Curated annotation (Swiss-Prot):
The chain crosses the membrane at residues 36-56, 76-96, 105-125, 143-163, 177-197, 225-245. It is found in: Cell membrane. Glycans are attached at N128. Belongs to the MIP/aquaporin (TC 1.A.8) family. A motif (NPA 2) lies at residues 206-208. The lineage of its organism: Eukaryota, Metazoa, Ecdysozoa, Tardigrada, Eutardigrada. Its main location: membrane. It holds the Pfam family MIP. Keywords: Cell membrane, Glycoprotein, Membrane, Repeat, Stress response, Transmembrane, Transmembrane helix, Transport. Probable water-specific aquaporin that may modulate the water content and osmolytes during anhydrobiosis. It is a multi-pass membrane protein. Aquaporins contain two tandem repeats each containing three membrane-spanning domains and a pore-forming loop with the signature motif Asn-Pro-Ala (NPA). It comes from Milnesium tardigradum. This is Aquaporin-6. One of its GO terms (cellular component) is plasma membrane.
C-alpha cells in the first residue's frame, strides 16, 4: 500500500481548508438584522405546514404523488428564499457550506413548528374516524428494522444527492434556464423515493414528519429510531458522494467573476447584507 508524502498531504489539506473558507461566516447578530433571514424562516414554517397537510394520506399511490407534487410547487414558490422543508436537507446545506450553523438551527426550529402545526391540522381538522382512508398515515414499520433502515436510508440518499446542486454554495447553474426545472426534478425525487418506501416504512424520509405524526398515536413509538438514523446516515453519504464527485470548475462572466446561481441563497443573501457588513463572497473565496 502506497502512502502519500508530506507535500501531497499538505496539498489535500489545503484544498479542504479552502473549501471550508468558502462557507458563510456571518454572525448571528448580522443575520437577524437582515430581512432575508426572517423571510426564510417564514418560508420554511409555511412550507412545512402545507407539505404536511398535503402528504399525510394513507393511500399508497395518492400519498407519494401528492408528496412529490406539493414539494415541487413549494420549491418553485420559495426557491429564491428557502425551500428545504426537511431538517435533513437543512443539515445537508450546512455540510455543503451553504448556510451558517445559526441559520441551520433557526430553519430546523421553523420546520419543526410548521410540521407540528400541519400534523395537528391533519388529525383534528381533516381526519374522519368514520372513514378509514381519511386518517393520516402512521409511522409504523411493515418490515424488519434493518430493512426499514435501508428504505429510509436509500430514499433520503437519492433526495439529498439530487438536491445537492441547489444546496452547494460553490455550484452554478448556466443561464440557459435549467434552474427552472430544478423544482420539478426535486419533486420527482421526493415522490419516487417516498413511493419506493411507502409500503415498508410509510415513505417519510423526514425525521420531524415521522415524529409529528407519532405524537398523536402513542402506540407507534416502537422502532421509531429508524426514522431518524436512516435519513441522517443517508444524508451524510449523499453529501460525501456529491462533495467528491462534483465538478470544480466554476462558471465565469465576461469580467472573470464567478457566477453564483439565483437558486442559491448565498448570492441573494450577500446582496442584502452588503450595505451593513464588509463580508462578501469575494472575501470568503
Amino acid at each position: 500500500m502506497a502512502f502519500m508524502d508530506k507535500s501531497e498531504v499538505r496539498q489535500r489539506l489545503q484544498k479542504v481548508l479552502q473549501q471550508c473558507a468558502k462557507a458563510p461566516t456571518w454572525s448571528p447578530k448580522e443575520e437577524v438584522r437582515q430581512s432575508i433571514f426572517w423571510k426564510s424562516i417564514r418560508a420554511e414554517l409555511i412550507g412545512s405546514l402545507v407539505l404536511m397537510v398535503f402528504s399525510c394520506s394513507r393511500d399508497s399511490i395518492y400519498g407519494p404523488v401528492s408528496y412529490g407534487c406539493t414539494y415541487a410547487i413549494l420549491s418553485y414558490c420559495f426557491k429564491s428564499i428557502s425551500a428545504h422543508f426537511n431538517p435533513v436537507i437543512t443539515i445537508a446545506a450546512l455540510l455543503l457550506r451553504s448556510i451558517t450553523p445559526f441559520r441551520c438551527i433557526s430553519l430546523v426550529l421553523a420546520q419543526t413548528l410548521g410540521t407540528l402545526s400541519g400534523a395537528s391540522v391533519c388529525y383534528y381538522g381533516l381526519s374522519n374516524e368514520t372513514e378509514t382512508g381519511s386518517a393520516p398515515i402512521s409511522p409504523v414499520l411493515n418490515v424488519s428494522p434493518a430493512k426499514g433502515f435501508g428504505y429510509e436510508f436509500f430514499g433520503t440518499f437519492v433526495i439529498i444527492l439530487t438536491m445537492s446542486s441547489y444546496l452547494d454554495c460553490n455550484d452554478y447553474v448556466s443561464e440557459s434556464g435549467d434552474s427552472n426545472l430544478l423544482p420539478l426534478i426535486f419533486g420527482l425525487s421526493v415522490g419516487l423515493s417516498s413511493g419506493m418506501a411507502r409500503q415498508a416504512t410509510g415513505g417519510f424520509l423526514n425525521p420531524m414528519r415521522a415524529f409529528s405524526l407519532a405524537l398523536f398515536e402513542l402506540n407507534h413509538w416502537s422502532n421509531h429510531y429508524i426514522y431518524w438514523i436512516g435519513p441522517i446516515f443517508g444524508c451524510l453519504l449523499a453529501v460525501f458522494t456529491f462533495d467528491y464527485t462534483r465538478p470544480i470548475i466554476p462558471n465565469r462572466d465576461s469580467n472573470n467573476r464567478i457566477n453564483f446561481p439565483t437558486f442559491n441563497k448565498n448570492n441573494k443573501y450577500e446582496v442584502e447584507m452588503q450595505p451593513e457588513t464588509e463580508i462578501t463572497l469575494a472575501t470568503l473565496a
